[in-house]
């Protein structure tokens, strides 16, 4: 498979090193705040798009956490899923924002963590989203996943739920590929890892890929709002089942009392309405993560069993870490 330069192994290694050096580490003794939280809380995430300032989309959440915990929140932008997973396993990350696939893989690899809540697009909504199979609107020969056979197909990242795992399951169900192995996928098409959901969509729009995958909001809203895509420029030829939402998780090393407090905090106060009331931000600037989420709602580990099932269907090596 082809992988863009910024997703090479050296970059992944550098990412892990960054997490190791920049973070205080949950496994290291440190004093606590008056509220009972570590003096420094490390929050790690990766961009769903090629963002140079991911932190800005977390600012309202960071302000809320710092006010309620009395802690200094240290934000770390990782370059790929592997860095965040390794940081959590190593105890160098206290809180992390995971795609569903990365959350499951982190657990498989031994990360001890508890889900704090999953993001929702709008107030009152359910935590979940879909993967889209995409082609250019003027491409008459691609109208479903079967038509991806023999084509240049953009995936996002080997650790992406909606950019790799669910698409692979769909391709297997349509008989396009035999399994989720690199060899079987490469035998059926020319796969390219674009590195981001926006990069995947742009590569399709620009003709660098004949077809590909990205998650729904990135194509339906984010890129159109930014002017990167025109309405109707791409067509959706496939939609996955609903995928459990991207999730904030806490390192179990924080302890059950702290984690319970964080669960309540995320459920009650990690949302646009609360951020605005506190004066942390206004309007769309209050939407958090680069998924532009309205807020966070409670979830359990069992909510991610659907992802585990798709791992079983695909037999993907990536599900094993």
UniProtKB/Swiss-Prot annotation:
GO BP term, example: phosphate ion transport
Record flagged with keyword Signal: yes
Lipidated residues (S-diacylglycerol cysteine): 23
Database matches in InterPro entries: PhnD
Lipidated residues (N-palmitoyl cysteine): 23
Pfam families for this protein: Phosphonate-bd (PF12974)
GO annotation, cellular component aspect: ATP-binding cassette (ABC) transporter complex
Keywords: Cell membrane, Lipoprotein, Membrane, Palmitate, Phosphate transport, Signal, Transport
Signal peptide (residue range): 1-22
Swiss-Prot/TrEMBL induction comment: By phosphate-limited conditions, via derepression by PhnF, and probably also via the two-component regulatory system senX3/regX3.
Location(s) in or outside the cell: Cell membrane
Membrane-topology descriptor: Lipid-anchor
Gene3D superfamilies found in the cross-reference section: Periplasmic binding protein-like II
Family: Belongs to the phosphate/phosphite/phosphonate binding protein family.
Protein task: Part of the ABC transporter complex PhnCDE involved in phosphate import. Responsible for phosphate binding.
The protein's assembly and partners: The complex is composed of two ATP-binding proteins (PhnC), two transmembrane proteins (PhnE) and a solute-binding protein (PhnD).
Identification of the protein by name: Phosphate-import protein PhnD
């Amino acid at each position: 498979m082809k992988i863009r330069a910024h997703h090479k192994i050296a970059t992944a290694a550098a990412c892990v090193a960054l997490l190791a050096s920049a973070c205080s580490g949950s496994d290291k003794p440190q004093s606590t705040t008056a509220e009972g939280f570590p003096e420094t809380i490390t929050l790690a995430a990766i961009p769903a798009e090629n963002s140079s300032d991911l932190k800005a989309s977390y600012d309202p959440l960071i302000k809320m956490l710092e006010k309620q915990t009395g802690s200094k929140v240290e934000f770390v932008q990782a370059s790929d899923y592997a860095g965040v997973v390794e940081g959590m396993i190593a105890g160098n990350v206290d809180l992390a924002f995971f795609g569903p696939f990365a959350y499951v893989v982190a657990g498989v690899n031994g990360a001890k963590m508890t889900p704090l809540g999953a993001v929702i697009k709008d107030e009152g909504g359910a935590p979940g989203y879909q993967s889209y199979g995409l082609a250019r609107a003027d491409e008459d020969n691609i109208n479903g996943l079967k038509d991806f056979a023999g084509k240049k197909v953009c995936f996002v990242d080997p650790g992406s739920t909606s950019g790799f795992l669910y698409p692979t399951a769909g391709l297997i169900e349509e008989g396009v590929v035999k399994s989720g192995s690199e060899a079987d996928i490469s035998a059926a098409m020319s796969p390219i890892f674009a590195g981001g959901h926006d990069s995947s969509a742009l590569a399709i729009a620009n003709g660098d890929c004949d077809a590909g995958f990205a998650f729904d909001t990135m194509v339906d809203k984010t890129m159109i709002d930014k002017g990167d895509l025109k309405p109707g420029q791409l067509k959706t030829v496939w939609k996955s089942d609903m995928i459990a939402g991207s999730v904030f998780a806490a390192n179990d090393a924080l302890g059950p009392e702290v984690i319970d407090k964080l669960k309540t905090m995320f459920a009650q106060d990690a949302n646009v309405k609360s951020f605005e009331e506190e004066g942390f931000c206004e309007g769309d600037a209050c939407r958090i993560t680069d998924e532009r989420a309205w807020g966070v709602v409670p979830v359990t580990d069992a909510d991610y069993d659907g992802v585990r099932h798709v791992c079983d269907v695909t037999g993907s090596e990536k599900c094993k870490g």
